[in-house]
């Protein structure tokens, strides 16, 4: 279950990649703008502000996120991105930090250009940090005998979940698009107790939390916290640097 409040705890850090992604989309007067994986809608509303004359279509697979987006006045619907098909007037498709959850996302990126009108834009951002300590430590802890019996079916993600920018660029170029792809590592300054643990609780640890009972979840967090604190030590000023690699691709259908 997604927790919109937990996700929004780091809204500024999560928002910056979205705005940098959209800065490369040069759509002037799109008819329909689509946000796939809109989350709680806090970033989606900026699409309406940028393109006020466009029809804004937003969806997410999480009912909690859809409810939060609707509370912001968005006409959001619950939908699996794999089931989405663009309407004929779709001129901009945005997916920010969502497709890493979809194993078939490469096939979607091949398919969408064949379904979109000429001149349409596709803008995608995915995390590229699955080999970072924030992920490897979780996978290691979950594999220990104490936890492996409780977490046999949790889909822990490795670096193969997403591709490098050049791979996405090639995929979309082969699909007939003009492509702009890049990566950025944000050295994020976090504050508070166990800030990296709090960050991943809203995303990477969600399947773990869903699989455990409340007492087990508390114990897992208790064991995980010092391991993350060692990998991401607190600085003398009380802050913690959390490097986070992200992958971007913007494509225009030719």
UniProtKB/Swiss-Prot annotation:
Catalysed reactions listed for this entry: trans-aconitate + S-adenosyl-L-methionine = (E)-3-(methoxycarbonyl)pent-2-enedioate + S-adenosyl-L-homocysteine
Q: Does the keyword Magnesium apply?
A: no
Task: Report which superkingdom the organism of origin falls in.
Answer: Bacteria
BP-aspect Gene Ontology terms: methylation
Q: What class of enzyme is it?
A: transferase
Q: Which InterPro entries match?
A: SAM-dependent_MTases_sf (IPR029063), Trans-aconitate_MeTrfase (IPR023506), Trans_acon_MeTrfase_C (IPR023149)
Q: Which GO terms describe its molecular function?
A: trans-aconitate 2-methyltransferase activity
UniProt EC number: 2.1.1.144
Q: Which Gene Ontology cellular-component terms appear in the entry?
A: cytoplasm
Chief localization class?
A: cytoplasm
Q: Which family does it belong to?
A: Belongs to the methyltransferase superfamily. Tam family.
The cross-references to HAMAP family, in alphabetical order and at most eight, read: Tran_acon_Me_trans
What name does this protein carry?
A: Trans-aconitate 2-methyltransferase
Q: What is the lineage of its organism?
A: Bacteria, Bacillati, Actinomycetota, Actinomycetes, Mycobacteriales
């Amino acid at each position: 279950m997604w927790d919109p409040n937990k996700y929004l705890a780091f809204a500024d850090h999560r928002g910056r990649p979205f705005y940098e992604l959209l800065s490369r989309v040069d759509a002037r007067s799109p008819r329909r703008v689509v946000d796939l994986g809109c989350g709680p809608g806090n970033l989606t509303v900026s699409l309406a502000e940028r393109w006020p004359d466009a029809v804004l279509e937003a969806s997410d697979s999480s009912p909690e996120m859809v409810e939060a987006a609707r509370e912001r006045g968005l006409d959001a619907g619950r939908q699996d991105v794999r089931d989405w098909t663009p309407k004929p007037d779709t001129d901009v498709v945005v997916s920010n930090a969502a497709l890493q959850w979809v194993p078939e996302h490469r096939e979607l990126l091949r398919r969408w250009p064949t379904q979109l009108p000429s001149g349409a834009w596709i803008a995608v951002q995915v995390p590229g940090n699955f080999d970072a300590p924030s992920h490897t430590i979780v996978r290691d802890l979950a594999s220990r005998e104490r936890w492996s019996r409780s977490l046999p079916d949790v889909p822990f993600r490795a670096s193969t979940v997403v591709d490098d920018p050049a791979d996405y660029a090639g995929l979309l170029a082969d699909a007939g698009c003009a492509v702009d792809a890049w990566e950025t590592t944000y050295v994020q300054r976090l504050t508070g107790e166990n800030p990296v643990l709090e960050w991943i609780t809203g995303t990477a640890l969600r399947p773990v939390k869903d699989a455990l009972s409340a007492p087990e979840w508390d114990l897992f967090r208790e064991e995980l916290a010092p391991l993350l604190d060692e990998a991401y030590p607190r600085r003398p000023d009380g802050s913690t640097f959390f490097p986070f690699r992200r992958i971007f691709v913007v494509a225009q259908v030719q």
